[in-house]
Amino acid sequence: MTDPLSRAGLVIVDKPAGMTSHDVVSRCRRIFSTRKVGHAGTLDPMATGVLVIGIERATKIMGLLTLTTKSYAATIRFGQSTSTDDAEGEVLQTISASHLTEVDIEAAVAGLRGDIAQVPSSVSAIKVDGQRAYKLAREGQSVELAARPVRISRFDVLAVRGSGEDLIDVDVEIDCSSGTYIRALARDAGAALGVGGHLTALRRTRVGDFGLDRARTLEELADGATLTLDLDSACRQGFPRRDLDAAEVDAVRNGRPLAPAGIEGTYAAVDADDRVIALLADKGSRTTSVVVLRPANL
């Protein structure tokens, strides 16, 4: 019998510039001939790179996967600040950056490494009074967002070069926690240097365990709609494992709890055929089902 979950899994897409993350979801719906498609970790339209897409029943695990670390390659332009903190916004101010040295730039970058409190860009998806901040900002309303803790574990300067008479472009690589706004790092580094700054290029190179080496373009997927990881492989890779006997499999498929496993957090409950039956979590003296992937009625 054909496994009903054979079409479910993860696809790692190399998002092109000019498309929203939802645009990519829409394309994947057509490519994989299903409405059940979702994504984890939004990328701005100007950005390219790794976007994790869930197909069919894999959409149920997207919020559970550990995708808390991200890596980027970016270019920051010093000497101009913009309304969006990137190249798509209106230039608000231009101040000559020609006097800046590599030592100056490294000092500004160093001040943004480690655990910091970051004020997100006003043009962001954060909700303010029930509305997205970017919507309010584009309507001309003043948006004030609270600082939030983020971790910048790597912020390396790769190259410094002139861009015109007064501007300087700096290529950087960044490893950071989920929720970090790279545009805000560009803004804050420019502010620290007293000349303003904004992002001119952004490429996400890694999300969690998924890097560009596993990513495929939409054109490649259109030529062959294959999963990067099927649902079982994604769960076995993304969560601790608990092996079940036949009686335990029957219990889980029918919504009955098991004795706790002593495993911290969410874990994959796997049958003798290496299929993931459910994602479970211990709760006191029993398990609770986080999501049952293969219920009895499937």
Curated annotation (Swiss-Prot):
Q: What NCBIfam families does the annotation carry?
A: TruB
Provide the family line.
Belongs to the pseudouridine synthase TruB family. Type 1 subfamily.
Q: What is its EC number?
A: 5.4.99.25
- What residues sit in the active site? 44
Q: What does the UniProt keyword field contain? A: Isomerase, tRNA processing
Q: Broadest EC class?
A: isomerase
**What's this protein's name?**
tRNA pseudouridine synthase B
Q: What is the lineage of its organism?
A: Bacteria, Bacillati, Actinomycetota, Actinomycetes, Mycobacteriales
Q: Which gene encodes it?
A: truB
